[in-house]
UniProtKB/Swiss-Prot annotation:
Protein name (Swiss-Prot/TrEMBL): Ribosome-binding factor A
Domain of life the protein comes from: Bacteria
Annotated organism of origin: Mycobacterium tuberculosis (strain ATCC 25618 / H37Rv)
Gene3D superfamilies, per the entry: 3.30.300.20
Known partners and oligomeric status: Monomer. Binds 30S ribosomal subunits, but not 50S ribosomal subunits or 70S ribosomes.
GO process annotations (BP): maturation of SSU-rRNA; ribosome biogenesis
Gene Ontology CC: one annotated term: cytosol
Principal location listed in the UniProt entry: cytoplasm
Keyword Cytoplasm: yes
Location of the region described as Disordered in the Swiss-Prot/TrEMBL record: 132-183
Family the UniProt entry places it in: Belongs to the RbfA family.
Matching InterPro entries: KH_dom-like_a/b, RbfA, RbfA_dom_sf, Ribosome-bd_factorA_CS
Length: 183
């Protein structure tokens, strides 16, 4: 087994060799518009997966992914020979070509973010003249908490009537009315 750093270096080199061969050496019209985006090599360096994208002939043309896949399959042997000559490893990895869907995912994510921004802008327009439904501060309670007359602590008012009782706060829930002996 090779270490991960060697596998990454080999994958990078394979991607560069395949991209160069597709662009300059292999004259298959089905490979026009094919771009190599990435390559991954297994830990034993015997298999390589090469990721590619396909562009249309113009900006408005749909890419011919099936034609590009067929052209890559036809050129697989030549590309593997070039990879073997260019890398100098004892065993030339077998090449597998996979259509890279990252660009489609990025495009879909951009669309979702644009929709979210539009929804945020609509919400901001609605908020401009909006007022709260109730009071400005619904949690404010005028005069319900007062200082405790009990020494050393705060109290909690248990009712707001004329017979309001201040209950001292105690720590640990000790109310003093249990039957345990005091130490």
């Amino acid at each position: 087994m090779a270490d991960a750093a060697r596998a990454r270096r080999l994958a990078k080199r394979i991607a560069a060799i395949v991209a160069s061969a597709i662009e300059y050496e292999i004259k298959d019209p089905g490979l026009a518009g094919v771009t190599i985006t990435d390559a991954k090599v297994t830990a034993d360096l015997h298999d390589a997966t090469v990721y590619y994208t396909v562009m249309g002939r113009t900006l408005h043309d749909e890419p011919n992914c099936a034609g590009a896949a067929a052209a890559l399959e036809r050129a697989k042997g030549v590309l593997r020979t070039k990879v073997g000559a260019g890398t100098g490893v004892r065993f030339t990895p077998t090449l597998t070509f996979t259509l890279d869907t990252i660009s489609d995912s990025v495009h879909r994510m951009d669309e979702l973010l644009a929709r979210a921004r539009a929804a945020d802008a609509d919400l901001a327009r609605v908020r401009v003249g909006a007022k709260p439904a109730g009071e400005a501060d619904p949690y404010r309670d005028n005069g319900s908490v007062a200082q405790s007359p009990a020494p050393g602590g705060l109290g909690i008012r248990t009712s707001d009537g004329p017979e309001a009782v201040e209950a001292p706060l105690t720590c640990g829930g000790d109310t003093g009315d249990d039957d345990r002996p005091k130490e």
